[in-house]
Amino acid sequence: MKPMSKIQIYTTNWCPYCNAAKALLDDKGVAYDEIDVTDPQLRMDMIQRAHGRRTVPQIFIGEQHVGGYDDLSALERRGQLDPLLS
């Protein structure tokens, strides 16, 4: 079993914001684990870990809950994403 990446992103395959978040992370050249929440148990795990948030994507860097795509892109615009990723 491969070790978990520092970054986890909870997604569905039909979510445009999930695709945008993955594209931003891909552009940064960072590895991440994608967790498909069409599995009901994984969705419940996401909701619990994200303190009740039910929308996707939900992004975690280490143990820090970043939030969704808007939150991730706001960190990028403010120059605060790269330090979290390093």
What is the role of each PLM region?
Residues 31-43:
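Thiol-based oxidoreductase modules, predominantly thioredoxin-like and allied folds used
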Residues 61-86:
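Non-catalytic, surface beta->alpha helical segment in thiol-disulfide oxidoreductase systems
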Residues 2-31:
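Local sequence-structure signature of Cys/Sec-based thiol-disulfide redox active-site neighborhoods
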Residues 51-59, 70:
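Structural micro-motif
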Residues 50-51, 85:
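A broad structural signal for alpha-helix termini and local helix breaks/kinks
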Residues 16, 41, 54, 67:
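Short alpha-helical
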Residues 43, 53-56, 78:
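A general structural signal for well-ordered alpha-helical segments in protein cores
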